[in-house]
Amino acid sequence: LLVKEDAPVYAACIGLYLFLEKRQYLWGGAVFLFSCLYFTSAVWFLDHFGDGAMINRFDSYISDESYGLLSMFKTILVDPAYVLAQILTPDKILFLLQMLLPLGFLPLMSLRLGKWVLLIPFVLINLMSNYKYQHSIFFQYTYGSGALLFYLAMVNFRDLKLPIFRQLRSLFLGSGLFCAVALVLTV
Protein backbone atom coordinates (compact mmCIF):
# COMPACT_ATOMS: atom_id res chain seq x y z
CA LEU A 1 0.00 0.00 0.00
CA LEU A 2 2.95 2.36 0.33
CA VAL A 3 2.99 2.86 -3.44
CA LYS A 4 -0.77 3.21 -3.84
CA GLU A 5 -1.64 6.86 -4.21
CA ASP A 6 -5.28 6.16 -3.32
CA ALA A 7 -4.51 4.50 0.05
CA PRO A 8 -4.12 7.89 1.81
CA VAL A 9 -7.64 8.79 0.69
CA TYR A 10 -8.97 5.97 2.87
CA ALA A 11 -6.66 6.93 5.75
CA ALA A 12 -7.59 10.63 5.49
CA CYS A 13 -11.28 9.78 5.72
CA ILE A 14 -10.62 7.56 8.73
CA GLY A 15 -8.76 10.49 10.27
CA LEU A 16 -11.76 12.75 9.64
CA TYR A 17 -14.00 10.09 11.16
CA LEU A 18 -11.83 9.94 14.28
CA PHE A 19 -11.85 13.74 14.48
CA LEU A 20 -15.57 14.35 13.83
CA GLU A 21 -17.27 11.25 15.20
CA LYS A 22 -14.99 9.84 17.87
CA ARG A 23 -13.78 13.26 19.08
CA GLN A 24 -10.18 12.04 19.01
CA TYR A 25 -8.87 15.37 17.81
CA LEU A 26 -5.17 14.69 18.14
CA TRP A 27 -5.16 11.27 16.48
CA GLY A 28 -7.78 12.17 13.90
CA GLY A 29 -6.01 15.38 12.94
CA ALA A 30 -2.63 13.64 12.80
CA VAL A 31 -3.93 10.80 10.62
CA PHE A 32 -5.68 13.26 8.31
CA LEU A 33 -2.70 15.59 7.94
CA PHE A 34 -0.18 12.77 7.51
CA SER A 35 -2.43 11.14 4.89
CA CYS A 36 -2.74 14.39 2.94
CA LEU A 37 1.01 14.92 3.13
CA TYR A 38 1.66 11.35 2.02
CA PHE A 39 -0.84 11.68 -0.84
CA THR A 40 0.82 14.81 -2.21
CA SER A 41 4.26 13.20 -1.77
CA ALA A 42 3.17 10.01 -3.55
CA VAL A 43 1.65 11.96 -6.45
CA TRP A 44 4.76 14.15 -6.70
CA PHE A 45 6.99 11.05 -6.62
CA LEU A 46 4.91 9.31 -9.31
CA ASP A 47 4.96 12.45 -11.48
CA HIS A 48 8.74 12.87 -11.24
CA PHE A 49 10.02 9.30 -11.11
CA GLY A 50 7.23 7.21 -12.61
CA ASP A 51 4.43 7.39 -15.12
CA GLY A 52 2.44 9.82 -13.00
CA ALA A 53 -0.68 9.35 -10.93
CA MET A 54 -3.57 7.84 -12.84
CA ILE A 55 -5.72 10.96 -12.77
CA ASN A 56 -6.91 10.18 -16.30
CA ARG A 57 -9.53 8.02 -14.59
CA PHE A 58 -11.13 11.28 -13.48
CA ASP A 59 -10.70 13.20 -16.76
CA SER A 60 -14.39 13.98 -17.03
CA TYR A 61 -14.11 16.10 -13.85
CA ILE A 62 -10.89 17.94 -14.70
CA SER A 63 -11.83 21.20 -16.39
CA ASP A 64 -8.35 22.75 -16.34
CA GLU A 65 -5.46 20.33 -16.79
CA SER A 66 -2.93 22.80 -15.45
CA TYR A 67 -4.52 22.44 -11.99
CA GLY A 68 -4.76 18.63 -12.14
CA LEU A 69 -6.74 17.11 -9.28
CA LEU A 70 -7.50 20.53 -7.79
CA SER A 71 -9.60 21.22 -10.87
CA MET A 72 -11.62 18.12 -10.01
CA PHE A 73 -12.64 19.57 -6.65
CA LYS A 74 -13.71 22.78 -8.39
CA THR A 75 -15.99 20.74 -10.67
CA ILE A 76 -17.49 18.92 -7.67
CA LEU A 77 -18.30 22.21 -5.91
CA VAL A 78 -19.41 24.22 -8.95
CA ASP A 79 -21.43 21.58 -10.82
CA PRO A 80 -22.78 18.86 -8.49
CA ALA A 81 -25.52 17.97 -11.01
CA TYR A 82 -22.82 17.01 -13.52
CA VAL A 83 -21.13 14.87 -10.87
CA LEU A 84 -24.41 13.10 -10.10
CA ALA A 85 -25.00 12.51 -13.81
CA GLN A 86 -21.56 10.88 -14.05
CA ILE A 87 -22.20 8.75 -10.96
CA LEU A 88 -25.74 7.63 -11.77
CA THR A 89 -25.01 5.60 -14.89
CA PRO A 90 -26.58 2.13 -15.24
CA ASP A 91 -23.35 0.21 -14.57
CA LYS A 92 -22.54 2.33 -11.51
CA ILE A 93 -26.07 1.98 -10.15
CA LEU A 94 -25.70 -1.80 -10.46
CA PHE A 95 -22.35 -1.56 -8.65
CA LEU A 96 -23.94 0.59 -5.96
CA LEU A 97 -26.63 -2.04 -5.44
CA GLN A 98 -24.09 -4.86 -5.41
CA MET A 99 -22.15 -3.10 -2.67
CA LEU A 100 -25.02 -1.79 -0.52
CA LEU A 101 -27.82 -4.35 -0.92
CA PRO A 102 -25.98 -7.17 0.91
CA LEU A 103 -25.44 -4.71 3.75
CA GLY A 104 -29.13 -3.77 3.81
CA PHE A 105 -28.16 -0.18 2.95
CA LEU A 106 -27.07 0.12 6.59
CA PRO A 107 -24.00 2.25 5.76
CA LEU A 108 -26.41 5.00 4.69
CA MET A 109 -28.60 4.86 7.82
CA SER A 110 -27.10 7.61 9.89
CA LEU A 111 -27.62 11.32 10.20
CA ARG A 112 -24.19 11.92 11.72
CA LEU A 113 -21.71 13.74 9.47
CA GLY A 114 -18.79 11.97 11.11
CA LYS A 115 -20.04 8.63 9.81
CA TRP A 116 -20.78 9.93 6.32
CA VAL A 117 -17.14 10.90 5.76
CA LEU A 118 -16.38 7.17 5.59
CA LEU A 119 -18.48 7.07 2.40
CA ILE A 120 -16.17 9.54 0.64
CA PRO A 121 -13.74 6.87 -0.67
CA PHE A 122 -16.65 4.82 -2.03
CA VAL A 123 -17.96 7.80 -3.97
CA LEU A 124 -14.58 9.28 -4.92
CA ILE A 125 -12.58 6.17 -5.78
CA ASN A 126 -15.30 3.84 -7.04
CA LEU A 127 -18.28 5.83 -8.28
CA MET A 128 -16.64 8.94 -9.70
CA SER A 129 -14.00 7.10 -11.70
CA ASN A 130 -14.56 6.49 -15.40
CA TYR A 131 -12.29 3.41 -15.23
CA LYS A 132 -14.72 0.50 -15.50
CA TYR A 133 -12.80 -1.79 -13.17
CA GLN A 134 -13.08 0.64 -10.27
CA HIS A 135 -16.83 0.19 -10.16
CA SER A 136 -16.84 -3.59 -10.44
CA ILE A 137 -16.99 -5.97 -7.51
CA PHE A 138 -14.81 -8.42 -9.41
CA PHE A 139 -11.62 -6.35 -9.05
CA GLN A 140 -9.48 -5.20 -6.14
CA TYR A 141 -10.55 -1.56 -6.29
CA THR A 142 -13.38 -2.16 -3.82
CA TYR A 143 -11.22 -3.48 -0.97
CA GLY A 144 -10.83 -0.22 0.94
CA SER A 145 -14.27 1.24 0.42
CA GLY A 146 -15.85 -2.18 0.98
CA ALA A 147 -14.15 -2.45 4.37
CA LEU A 148 -15.39 1.02 5.32
CA LEU A 149 -18.92 0.17 4.16
CA PHE A 150 -18.87 -3.04 6.21
CA TYR A 151 -17.66 -1.11 9.26
CA LEU A 152 -20.39 1.51 8.79
CA ALA A 153 -23.00 -1.23 8.45
CA MET A 154 -21.95 -2.77 11.77
CA VAL A 155 -21.77 0.57 13.60
CA ASN A 156 -25.09 1.80 12.22
CA PHE A 157 -26.73 -1.55 12.97
CA ARG A 158 -25.56 -1.26 16.57
CA ASP A 159 -26.83 2.33 16.78
CA LEU A 160 -30.35 1.73 15.44
CA LYS A 161 -32.46 3.23 18.20
CA LEU A 162 -35.93 3.82 16.76
CA PRO A 163 -38.43 1.05 17.57
CA ILE A 164 -39.19 0.49 13.89
CA PHE A 165 -35.50 -0.11 13.19
CA ARG A 166 -35.28 -2.58 16.06
CA GLN A 167 -38.14 -4.51 14.50
CA LEU A 168 -36.39 -4.46 11.12
CA ARG A 169 -33.05 -5.78 12.41
CA SER A 170 -33.87 -9.37 11.48
CA LEU A 171 -35.01 -8.18 8.05
CA PHE A 172 -31.66 -6.42 7.55
CA LEU A 173 -29.77 -9.52 8.60
CA GLY A 174 -31.90 -11.78 6.42
CA SER A 175 -31.63 -9.59 3.32
CA GLY A 176 -27.88 -9.26 3.79
CA LEU A 177 -27.47 -13.01 4.15
CA PHE A 178 -29.69 -13.68 1.12
CA CYS A 179 -27.81 -11.19 -1.07
CA ALA A 180 -24.42 -12.49 0.05
CA VAL A 181 -25.39 -16.10 -0.71
CA ALA A 182 -26.92 -15.12 -4.06
CA LEU A 183 -23.79 -13.17 -4.98
CA VAL A 184 -21.47 -16.02 -4.04
CA LEU A 185 -23.54 -18.55 -5.98
CA THR A 186 -23.46 -16.44 -9.16
CA VAL A 187 -19.69 -15.90 -9.19
Regions found by a protein language model. Give the residues of each.
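Signature aromatic-anchored transmembrane alpha helix within multi-pass, membrane-resident enzymes
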Residues: 32-36, 160-187
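Hydrophobic, aromatic-rich transmembrane alpha-helices
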Residues: 86, 92-123
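Membrane-interface junctions at the ends of membrane-embedded or membrane-associated helices
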Residues: 18-27, 153-174
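Extracytoplasmic catalytic-loop and juxtamembrane helix elements of membrane-embedded
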Residues: 35-36, 42-82, 122-136, 142
